Amino acid sequence: MFPESFQIYFSEHQNLLYLSTLVLDLGLTVLMFRFFGKEGLLACIVLSILLANLQGPKLTVIFSMQTSLGVIFYSSIFFATDLMSEKFGKKEADRAVMMGFSISVIILLMLSISLLFLPSIQGNQTFSTEVHQAFVTILDFTPRFIIGSLFSYLI
């Protein structure tokens, strides 16, 4: 998706990639609030919960510590919920987070149903099987992240 030079640079500068992604995520949250108000914050909260849960299984090393990529998006969840609470009240912020978790559960359910479909045996069977296995791998961890996130929020 990105030019090869871009990929090479950031593969050698993972800490800078982390900080850039964090600034981009928080910056987009601010822009969404500026352009769309409460609905923009709601969209950011839902999107960040989804991204945090889907990217949670991917581990990397940032500043010499192993970490999940999901942590990047938790910062914008906290930022957006704090902003929503400040501007629109705690009840609206709680409602937005619960909507995000509800959508995560719905997406997880629908993606899990997709795993019941067998990979195609027509055409490129190897590719179909590899894609199916990739879905299985990602979705195997996602319920744990959704449940853990929900419990940590409720506590």
Residue ranges of each PLM-predicted region?
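Hydrophobic transmembrane alpha-helices
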Residues: 1-84, 91
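Alpha-helical transmembrane segments of multi-pass membrane proteins
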Residues: 49-53, 78, 82, 104-107, ...
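Short, highly charged low-complexity linear segments
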Residues: 58-59, 83-90, 113-119, 138-139
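Membrane-interface alpha-helices at helix entry/exit sites of multi-pass transporters
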Residues: 91-99
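Transmembrane alpha-helix/helix-exit interface in multi-pass inner-membrane proteins
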Residues: 98, 102-124
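Membrane-interface interhelical connector segments
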Residues: 114-143
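C-terminal membrane-adjacent module
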Residues: 128-132, 149-155
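Membrane-embedded alpha-helical bundles of multi-pass transporters/translocases
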Residues: 140-144, 148, 152
